[in-house]
């Protein structure tokens, strides 16, 4: 498959480029960056042996290169518009950018189905993180008292993380509604109890040195259960990205969540 990478200078995008180069059935045909200084990726020392054009305009790249799939790891500010543009050009998309609303996902799914092309948006591409979410969903049926703590590097722009939101959404499907905490609790400092989703509390930590980590903490009379996943390196996401790129060939709709394509 001919693959283009949007946001290739970001930490995730850079790792995606290396992954595409490693995979025998994937070919890197273009990269995209906001206002790039380079015209070819070989102007970067690490990729000096390659011949891959660098673009600053997404539509121009799509029309000139006509890739089979675009992998987008950019920012929440442009993730939606990028994905919409990719799909409207009839090109498959794998998107790790977070911050999409349910309405935006629904609209993008309609575009993918009208074009009969596959696309996948996932808040997390680490298989271990997907398993964490599935385990938490099952546990929430029996432990409705639960809070989420997600921890990421301090350059992450959105909070809570897409993984935390997706986890809460999945738990809400099996969990009896409980508003977590005392009914008359008072926040002495606003926000001390974190964000709230369907009665569950979500806490976001941003610190240098972290990559991506999440704990789902359940409490009950006389017992507790903690489910935790840690990504220590961005390589942990790459098998999921490669799998998703290949899977788009089989789809004619947009899938939200890596768990929906795992066997």
UniProtKB/Swiss-Prot annotation:
GO terms for molecular function: 4-hydroxy-tetrahydrodipicolinate reductase; NAD binding; NADP binding; oxidoreductase activity, acting on CH or CH2 groups, NAD or NADP as acceptor. Its main location: cytoplasm. GO terms for cellular component: cytosol. It is found in: Cytoplasm. GO terms for biological process: diaminopimelate biosynthetic process; lysine biosynthetic process via diaminopimelate. (S)-2,3,4,5-tetrahydrodipicolinate binds at residues 153, 162-163. The active site is at 152 (proton donor/acceptor), 156 (proton donor). Pfam families: DapB_C, DapB_N. NAD(+) binds at residues 7-12, 96-98, 122-125. This is 4-hydroxy-tetrahydrodipicolinate reductase. It comes from Listeria monocytogenes serotype 4b (strain F2365).
């Amino acid at each position: 498959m001919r693959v283009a990478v949007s946001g290739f200078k970001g930490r995730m995008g850079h790792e995606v480029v290396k992954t595409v180069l490693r995979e025998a059935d994937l070919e890197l045909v273009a990269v995209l960056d906001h206002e790039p200084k380079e015209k070819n990726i070989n102007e970067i020392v690490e990729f000096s042996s390659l011949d891959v054009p660098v673009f600053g305009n997404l539509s121009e790249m799509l029309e000139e290169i006509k890739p089979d799939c675009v992998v987008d790891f950019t920012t929440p500010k442009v993730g939606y518009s990028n994905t919409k543009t990719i799909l409207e050009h009839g090109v498959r998309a794998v998107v790790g950018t977070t911050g999409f609303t349910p309405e935006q996902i629904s609209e993008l799914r309609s575009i993918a189905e009208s074009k009969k092309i596959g696309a996948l948006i996932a808040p997390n591409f680490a298989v271990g993180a997907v398993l964490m979410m599935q385990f938490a969903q099952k546990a929430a049926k029996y432990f409705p008292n639960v809070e989420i703590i997600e921890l990421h590097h301090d350059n992450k722009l959105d909070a809570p993380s897409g993984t935390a939101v997706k986890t809460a959404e999945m738990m809400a499907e099996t969990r009896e509604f409980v508003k977590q905490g005392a009914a008359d609790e008072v926040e002495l400092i606003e926000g001390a109890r974190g964000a709230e989703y369907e009665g569950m509390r979500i806490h976001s930590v941003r610190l240098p040195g972290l990559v991506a980590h999440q704990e789902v903490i359940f409490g009950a009379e006389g017992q507790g259960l903690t489910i935790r996943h840690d990504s220590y390196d961005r390589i942990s996401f790459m098998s999921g990205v490669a799998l998703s790129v290949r899977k788009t060939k089989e789809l004619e709709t947009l899938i939200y969540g890596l768990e929906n394509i795992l066997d």
